[in-house]
Curated annotation (Swiss-Prot):
The gene is cdc37. Keywords: Cell cycle, Cell division, Chaperone, Cytoplasm, Nucleus, Phosphoprotein. This is Hsp90 co-chaperone Cdc37. Its main location: nucleus. SUPFAM superfamilies: Hsp90 co-chaperone CDC37. One of its GO terms (biological process) is protein folding. Forms a complex with Hsp90. Interacts with sty1. The modification Phosphoserine is found at S238. It comes from Schizosaccharomyces pombe (strain 972 / ATCC 24843).
Length: 466
């Protein structure tokens, strides 16, 4: 097969050109001279083409205005055409004040000069028998024809120069054939939620050392949980679970119906950040586990289905999304059967584990987490002060409003100032509500601490309000 070298025909000169030069002339110097000559001629040609384009644009605009002047004369046929055309050009002055060439005459001045040339021109033999209007019209048409001829010649010269510039390849002719770039904008990372650890401290009172250490946190009062965790391993597991936070996009994806693969595919393509976060599928599986514990098996299975979709698509990568969903949408394809089997097996494991946890909790009799009030220092005592009703003091009014916002049974317990009765009521309340009650008691001053002075002669503690 013959090799086609025609694509190199447009190379005007190259460093390895087979050029025969005089023996006294260095070939490299000759090639450099030829290159400089080519670039100079190319620059001159380019500038000439720009000048021709500018002249053509100027002549087209002048031609347009001369045609308007012709139309005005043909319609009016005045006795003094130059006054009429002068008025017409003055009316168009604001439009024609820009210059065709930077630093040159404006279009208005060029047209006024043309009108003066037409007026001062000597009459020809044919024009002697014409009136002024016909003379002016004839001379305008003559200038119009001259401009048309100039435009035609300029266009031919421009086409010749353009064809000459395309005879050889230049750097200006090089351009990108096609380019396809896809940039996936990474969504800003959402700040991770700080894990809140609930610290449970067990205080063992000793007869030999009744005074707690001075650096014990909350040395004056403590709101702690009533039941300490019995299994430290379970506590670590709960902390890991609390660290998994489901993003807003993850929540929306998890709530897509089971088997709605079209919506799932579209959502994942628009939110590729879900695939980038490896904890997203684990967080959805945790939601499935919680739903199963709450007795919502359908919702739990849906969450498992969506979590495994994320897991599969993350392994395939963004380019494999379309292929994966194309196969999984086909009920006769093996991929759908294998995927649904994986969903079923994962759900069964979650179901069995949640059932085992429920059974363990029932058998161990673990109570609900409670908030209790207790004094850490044995020499101190917690005391409740009920604010007076109808007081004019703003702080007392604020405390009274907080007291009246409590449930009636809690108000009765607080009025007894008996810590055991108060703790019974707090133990029956939800943890969040009980914490809010303790916060209000402390902030309004209803909860105070009584410090005692030990009378060594009688072995009694003398209460003293702090």
């Amino acid at each position: 097969m013959a090799i086609d070298y025609s694509k190199w025909d447009k190379l005007e000169l190259s460093d390895d050109s087979d050029i025969e030069v005089h023996p006294n002339v260095d070939k490299k110097s000759f090639i450099r001279w030829r290159q400089r000559d080519i670039h100079e001629k190319r620059a001159v040609r380019k500038q000439k083409m720009e000048d021709i384009k500018g002249a053509m644009a100027m002549n087209r605009r002048l031609l347009s205005r001369i045609s308007e002047m012709e139309t005005v004369l043909e319609k009016e046929s005045p006795s003094d055409p130059y006054v009429l055309l002068g008025s017409f050009l003055e009316a168009k002055k604001s439009e024609d004040m820009d210059s065709a060439i930077p630093g040159g005459m404006s279009y208005h001045h060029m047209l006024m000069s043309l009108l003066k040339v037409i007026k001062d021109a000597e009459d020809t033999t044919e024009e002697k028998s014409m009136d002024d209007s016909d003379k002016c019209l004839r001379r305008l048409k003559s200038h119009k024809e001259r401009l048309l001829k100039l435009l035609e010649d300029a266009q031919k010269e421009y086409d010749t120069l353009e064809a000459e510039s395309k005879n050889y390849i230049t750097s200006e002719d090089l351009h990108l054939g096609f380019d396809s770039t896809y940039v996936q904008k990474k969504e800003p990372e959402k700040p991770k939620k700080t894990k809140t650890k609930k610290e449970t401290i067990q205080v063992i009172e000793s007869l030999n050392n009744p005074t707690p250490p001075t650096d014990f946190p909350g040395a004056k009062e403590q709101a702690s949980t009533g039941n300490a965790p019995k299994n430290p391993v379970n506590e670590n597991e709960s902390e890991d679970e609390e660290g998994l936070s489901l993003s807003e996009d993850g929540k929306k994806f998890a709530n897509i119906d089971f088997g709605d693969y079209s919506s799932s595919e579209e959502f994942l393509k628009e939110h590729l950040n879900i695939l980038a976060d490896e904890e997203e599928s684990d967080a959805i599986l945790l939601e499935a586990f919680n739903a199963e514990l709450e007795g919502k098996p359908s919702l739990a299975k849906q969450y498992v289905h969506q979590a495994l979709l994320i897991s599969y698509c993350r392994q395939l990568g963004p380019n494999g999304l379309s292929i994966f969903f194309q196969k999984i949408k086909d009920p006769n394809h093996q991929s759908q059967r294998l995927f649904l089997e994986d969903v079923h097996n994962t759900y069964v494991r979650i179901h069995e584990r949640s059932a085992a946890i429920s059974k363990e909790q029932a058998e161990s009799g673990e109570g609900v987490e409670q908030i209790q009030l207790c004094a850490v220092d044995p020499n101190t005592k917690l005391s409740i002060t009920i604010p007076e009703a109808g007081s004019t003091d703003p702080e007392t009014q604020k405390a009274r409003a907080a007291f009246e916002s409590f449930p009636p049974n809690l108000q009765k317990a607080l009025m007894t100032n008996d810590l055991d009765k108060i703790n019974v009521v707090l133990g029956k309340m939800a943890v969040e509500n009980a914490e809010e009650v303790v916060e209000k008691l402390s902030s309004t001053g209803m909860l105070s601490i009584e410090e005692g002075i030990i009378d060594t002669t009688k072995g009694e503690t003398i209460p003293q309000l702090s």
